[in-house]
Curated annotation (Swiss-Prot):
F(1)F(0) ATP synthase produces ATP from ADP in the presence of a proton or sodium gradient. F-type ATPases consist of two structural domains, F(1) containing the extramembraneous catalytic core and F(0) containing the membrane proton channel, linked together by a central stalk and a peripheral stalk. During catalysis, ATP synthesis in the catalytic domain of F(1) is coupled via a rotary mechanism of the central stalk subunits to proton translocation. The keyword Transport applies. This is ATP synthase subunit b'. Gene3D superfamilies: 6.10.250.1580. Its main location: membrane. NCBIfam families: PRK13454.1. The gene is atpF2. The chain crosses the membrane at residues 39-59.
């Protein structure tokens, strides 16, 4: 019950203040009798806000901005260093690649020279071997012409034997002599 009594008294007090304000009329902010007091508190509040901004907020913001600017400039400097290192690495890579290509070309040229030398030697040997065989063949041809029919038959038999052997067969001498004799005679 005591609470209800207090609530009723509070409501009556508020109603009394409202009635008093209604009698004065107008808005309290526009009451010229309170302007000096309002101006004082306005200036005091603005001064406090100015002091807080000047001494606390703006220095903190400036420190954060300076820290960011330092970080950004440091990052840009590091990026520039990395860029220079990358250019140096690229130049070194290009030089190494060019050196490797030159070395490869040199090795290729040396290998070609060695192969050509070996090929020339093999060709010369083959030419000499062919020339020797040609000379031997010419001697045999001269002997065959000089030795007449019997020599032709011997050479033909030897040639047929060599051909059969070269082809991987076994030469039957009797059959070969008969075949060669028949061909030579006619």
């Amino acid at each position: 019950m005591a609470n209800e009594t207090n609530a009723v008294e509070a409501a009556a007090a508020v109603a009394g203040h409202a009635a008093e304000a209604a009698e004065k009329g107008g808005m309290p902010q526009l009451d010229f009798s309170t302007f000096p007091n309002q101006i004082f508190w306005l200036l005091l509040a603005l001064g406090a806000i100015y002091w807080l901004l000047k001494n606390i907020a703006i220095p903190r913001i400036a420190a954060i901005l300076a820290d960011r600017a330092g970080t950004i400039s440091g990052d840009l400097a590091a990026a520039e260093q990395y860029k220079l290192k990358a250019k140096d690495a690229e130049a070194a890579y290009a030089k190494a690649l060019a050196d490797a290509r030159a070395q490869a070309q040199k090795i290729i040229a040396e290998t070609r020279a060695v192969i050509q030398k070996d090929l020339d030697a093999a060709t010369a040997k083959a030419d000499a071997d062919i020339a020797a065989r040609v000379a031997q063949s010419e001697v045999k041809i001269a002997e065959i012409r000089a030795g007449a029919l019997e020599a032709v038959q011997i050479v033909a038999t030897d040639t047929a034997t060599a051909i059969v052997t070269a082809l991987g067969g076994k030469a039957d001498m009797g059959a070969l002599n008969a075949a060669v004799g028949q061909r030579v005679k006619g």
